[in-house]
Amino acid sequence: MKNLLICIIKMYRKYISPLKRPSCRFYPTCSQYSLEAIEKYGALKGTLISIKRILKCHPFNEGGYDPVK
């Protein structure tokens, strides 16, 4: 499952992300953060952490440096 999620994120980064303008308010980007979270915590917990981060990525949040802890 972990490898499937990583593959999906990498496909998103290669094929979908270039079609959109850069909009992530954080560093590392949300997709990189998701990869790191899934690698560190596994499929389930990493996905939940990633969803929480993606929900924070909006114009009303200041953003900034937010590494996987």
From Swiss-Prot:
Cited InterPro entries: Membr_insert_effic_factor_YidD
Compartment(s) where it occurs, according to its Swiss-Prot or TrEMBL record: Cell membrane
Keyword vocabulary terms for this entry: Cell membrane, Membrane
Descriptive protein name: Putative membrane protein insertion efficiency factor
Broad class of the protein's primary localization: membrane
Entries under PANTHER family matching the protein: MEMBRANE PROTEIN INSERTION EFFICIENCY FACTOR-RELATED
Family: Belongs to the UPF0161 family.
Free-text function comment from the UniProt entry: Could be involved in insertion of integral membrane proteins into the membrane.
Source organism per UniProt: Clostridium botulinum (strain Langeland / NCTC 10281 / Type F)
Membrane topology qualifier: Peripheral membrane protein
Alphabetized SMART domains for the sequence: Haemolytic
Gene Ontology cellular-component annotations: plasma membrane
Domain of life: Bacteria
